[in-house]
């Protein structure tokens, strides 16, 4: 303080001497302002020196942590218990396990791994502690929602999830597109419900791409047309087709005529091995008086029976691919596959497979193609 007083006195003497020499007051003021930053710099340096001193910070931190004597060293060195319930002491900075947790072992760990964390301010340490506590709380909330005990988290987490997923997924229908080769059609065959038997895919007559109808009119056919029915069953390849008749879908025809529903969103272009599967997780939505004729129809004399056009499908599928919901009287979700080996022979050449009987129900869907321009007359059920 004495030095600062002397410096201020000397500055004043210099100003008064220059004023006696007859200089203007403005020049004297300028001369007086020039040496003033020196004592201000000295003051700022003296003000900056107290923060690096460890004594006031340690005293303040000790004073704040005195009420929490039980976990004071854990908060000071950022050590927390494992959120998995094992009781291990973990470092909140690096996550390493601290053997024989104590203040000395925690300090030695910090000095070896990350000594810079000893200089963290109390606010930074509080932020780390808060984030750690939030993470532990989130883990506890997740475990509280799961019925399994915390000791066997990894073992029993997979069991309640499959039980809950089917309940949540029963309402909507799913459309899955598989871009696999035709050498792997066994997955739909294995997932096929027990009551279904393999069917050959229907023969769809060739139609021009320009005959597509608007989306709203696709399901409302004029009275002079009969939609072609598509039999559902597992996808077929040349190796799995039991039907030896020549006009079957395994004929070496390179041309591809997709149904109108499929052409609606692909324009007839399919990659190699394209498979479209429609899964319906719902049970029958109602008594299904409109669907029971389709489910009760049987194939006789090698020709399947025709039926009247089906009513409009649910609006959900109409907005996606214009595919009708296929309902099966079974508890397991059915699967429908559409392969690229449709042929161009007319509908009348469709026959039941070699190993099929004529008394099991077939589940059919509708398309907007016609058969020789004349509708078939459906037989009563």
From Swiss-Prot:
<keyword id="KW-0597">Phosphoprotein</keyword>
<keyword id="KW-0158">Chromosome</keyword>
<feature type="cross-link" description="Glycyl lysine isopeptide (Lys-Gly) (interchain with G-Cter in SUMO2)">
    <location>
        <position position="374"/>
    </location>
</feature>
<keyword id="KW-0805">Transcription regulation</keyword>
<feature type="compositionally biased region" description="Basic and acidic residues">
    <location>
        <begin position="287"/>
        <end position="299"/>
    </location>
</feature>
<feature type="cross-link" description="Glycyl lysine isopeptide (Lys-Gly) (interchain with G-Cter in SUMO2)">
    <location>
        <position position="290"/>
    </location>
</feature>
<feature type="modified residue" description="Phosphoserine">
    <location>
        <position position="148"/>
    </location>
</feature>
<feature type="modified residue" description="Phosphoserine">
    <location>
        <position position="248"/>
    </location>
</feature>
<feature type="modified residue" description="Phosphoserine">
    <location>
        <position position="310"/>
    </location>
</feature>
<dbReference type="GO" id="GO:0005634">
    <property type="term" value="C:nucleus"/>
</dbReference>
<dbReference type="InterPro" id="IPR040647">
    <property type="entry name" value="SPIN-DOC_Znf-C2H2"/>
</dbReference>
<comment type="function">
    <text>Chromatin protein that stabilizes SPIN1 and enhances its association with histone H3 trimethylated at both 'Lys-4' and 'Lys-9' (H3K4me3K9me3). Positively regulates poly-ADP-ribosylation in response to DNA damage; acts by facilitating PARP1 ADP-ribosyltransferase activity.</text>
</comment>
<feature type="cross-link" description="Glycyl lysine isopeptide (Lys-Gly) (interchain with G-Cter in SUMO2)">
    <location>
        <position position="294"/>
    </location>
</feature>
<feature type="compositionally biased region" description="Basic and acidic residues">
    <location>
        <begin position="218"/>
        <end position="228"/>
    </location>
</feature>
<comment type="subunit">
    <text>Interacts with SPIN1, SPIN2A, SPIN2B, SPIN3 and SPIN4. Interacts with TCF7L2 in a SPIN1-dependent manner. Interacts with PARP1; promoting PARP1 ADP-ribosyltransferase activity.</text>
</comment>
<keyword id="KW-0832">Ubl conjugation</keyword>
<feature type="modified residue" description="Phosphoserine">
    <location>
        <position position="251"/>
    </location>
</feature>
<dbReference type="GO" id="GO:0006974">
    <property type="term" value="P:DNA damage response"/>
</dbReference>
<feature type="modified residue" description="Phosphoserine">
    <location>
        <position position="121"/>
    </location>
</feature>
<feature type="region of interest" description="Disordered">
    <location>
        <begin position="42"/>
        <end position="73"/>
    </location>
</feature>
<protein>
    <recommendedName>
        <fullName>Spindlin interactor and repressor of chromatin-binding protein</fullName>
    </recommendedName>
</protein>
<keyword id="KW-0678">Repressor</keyword>
<dbReference type="InterPro" id="IPR052675">
    <property type="entry name" value="ZnF_transloc-Spindlin_int"/>
</dbReference>
<feature type="cross-link" description="Glycyl lysine isopeptide (Lys-Gly) (interchain with G-Cter in SUMO2)">
    <location>
        <position position="189"/>
    </location>
</feature>
<keyword id="KW-1017">Isopeptide bond</keyword>
<feature type="modified residue" description="Phosphoserine">
    <location>
        <position position="308"/>
    </location>
</feature>
<dbReference type="Pfam" id="PF18658">
    <property type="entry name" value="zf-C2H2_12"/>
</dbReference>
<feature type="region of interest" description="Disordered">
    <location>
        <begin position="283"/>
        <end position="320"/>
    </location>
</feature>
<dbReference type="GO" id="GO:0090734">
    <property type="term" value="C:site of DNA damage"/>
</dbReference>
<keyword id="KW-0804">Transcription</keyword>
<keyword id="KW-0227">DNA damage</keyword>
<dbReference type="GO" id="GO:0010835">
    <property type="term" value="P:regulation of protein ADP-ribosylation"/>
</dbReference>
<feature type="region of interest" description="Disordered">
    <location>
        <begin position="144"/>
        <end position="264"/>
    </location>
</feature>
<feature type="region of interest" description="Disordered">
    <location>
        <begin position="339"/>
        <end position="381"/>
    </location>
</feature>
<feature type="cross-link" description="Glycyl lysine isopeptide (Lys-Gly) (interchain with G-Cter in SUMO2)">
    <location>
        <position position="48"/>
    </location>
</feature>
<keyword id="KW-0539">Nucleus</keyword>
<dbReference type="GO" id="GO:0045892">
    <property type="term" value="P:negative regulation of DNA-templated transcription"/>
</dbReference>
<feature type="cross-link" description="Glycyl lysine isopeptide (Lys-Gly) (interchain with G-Cter in SUMO2)">
    <location>
        <position position="220"/>
    </location>
</feature>
């Amino acid at each position: 303080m004495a030095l600062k007083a002397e410096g201020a006195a000397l500055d004043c003497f210099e100003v008064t001497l220059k004023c006696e020499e007859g200089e203007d007051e403005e020049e004297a003021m300028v001369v007086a302002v020039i040496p003033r930053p020196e004592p201000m710099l000295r003051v700022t340096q003296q003000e900056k020196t107290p923060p690096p001193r460890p004594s006031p910070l340690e005293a303040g931190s000790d004073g704040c942590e005195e009420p929490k004597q039980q976990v004071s060293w854990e908060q000071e060195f950022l050590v927390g218990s494992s959120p998995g319930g094992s009781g291990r002491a973990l470092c909140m900075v690096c996550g390493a396990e601290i053997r024989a947790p104590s203040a000395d072992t925690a300090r030695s760990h910090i000095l070896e791994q990350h000594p810079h964390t000893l200089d963290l301010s109390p606010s930074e340490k509080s932020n780390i502690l808060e984030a750690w506590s939030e993470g532990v709380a989130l883990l506890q909330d997740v475990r509280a929602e799961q019925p399994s005990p915390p000791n066997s988290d990894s073992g029993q987490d997979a069991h309640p999830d499959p039980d809950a997923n089917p309940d949540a997924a029963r309402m909507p229908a799913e459309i899955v597109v598989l871009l696999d080769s035709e050498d792997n059609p066994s997955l739909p065959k294995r997932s096929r419900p027990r009551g279904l038997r393999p069917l050959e895919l229907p023969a769809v007559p060739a139609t021009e791409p320009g005959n597509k109808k608007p989306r709203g009119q696709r399901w409302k056919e004029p009275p002079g047309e009969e939609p072609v029915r598509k039999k559902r069953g597992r996808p077929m390849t040349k190796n799995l087709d039991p039907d030896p008749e020549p006009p079957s879908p395994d004929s070496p025809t390179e041309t591809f005529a997709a149904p109108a529903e499929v052409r609606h969103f692909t324009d007839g272009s399919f990659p190699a091995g394209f498979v479209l599967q429609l899964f319906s997780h719902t049970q029958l939505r109602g008594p299904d008086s409109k669907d029971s004729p389709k489910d009760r129809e049987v194939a006789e004399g090698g020709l399947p029976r025709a039926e009247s056009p089906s009513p409009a499908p649910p609006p959900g599928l109409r907005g996606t691919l214009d595919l009708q919901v296929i309902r099966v009287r079974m508890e397991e979700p059915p699967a429908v596959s559409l392969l690229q080996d449709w042929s161009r022979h007319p509908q009348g050449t469709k026959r039941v497979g070699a190993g099929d009987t004529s008394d099991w129900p077939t589940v059919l869907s509708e398309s907007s193609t016609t058969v020789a321009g004349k509708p078939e007359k459906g037989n009563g059920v």
